Design a protein with these regions (language model features):
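Anionic-ligand binding patches
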Residues: 4, 8-154
Length: 154
């Protein structure tokens, strides 16, 4: 899944660098559920359709979990960052971050967005939407990818 995101990010970063003539960083993130053929993956934002809301997307995941008579499934969030110094940069910075956990048919919490209400990270008895923002900003897939990116950037 990360390789598809990397390819998409590299294209986005190349367009950004060509347009701005400045250092460009592209991000692609998503929820991956291996038992559901690695869905929603790169289609996470529009899983239930182009005009789908976060609620629509969560409902589609929940329905698929229920269709296979499960309460939850292993899953992970993944974020890929690609940084280019110029449109033709031969050595882009590429960074990936993942957080593993489970997606559940139980949608709980007021915080976050996307699939956070049904994603329960490993080591927590809370959904991502229930975890305080300070903690979430330390453990999330985006935080991990950002830290890895900055280490390479130096």
């Amino acid at each position: 899944m990360g390789s598809e995101m990397c390819i998409r990010d590299r294209i986005k970063a190349k367009h950004g660098a060509a347009f701005s003539n400045k250092y460009t960083i592209a991000d692609d993130s998503g929820l991956v559920i291996p038992e559901l053929n690695y869905e929603p993956g790169i289609y996470s934002a529009r899983y239930a359709g182009d005009a789908a809301s976060d609620l629509d997307n969560r409902k589609k995941v929940i329905k698929k979990i229920e269709n296979i008579s499960k309460q939850s499934l292993d899953a992970y969030y993944v974020c890929v960052l690609v940084g280019l110094r110029a449109n033709d940069d031969p050595m882009p910075i590429i960074s990936e971050g993942k957080i593993h956990g489970r997606v559940s048919i139980n949608s709980i919490g007021d915080g976050g967005f996307g699939y956070d209400k049904i994603f329960y990270p490993r080591g927590f008895n809370l959904s991502m939407a229930q975890i305080d923002s300070e903690t979430k900003n330390k453990i999330s897939h985006r935080a991990i990818a950002s830290k890895n990116f900055l280490l390479q950037f130096k």
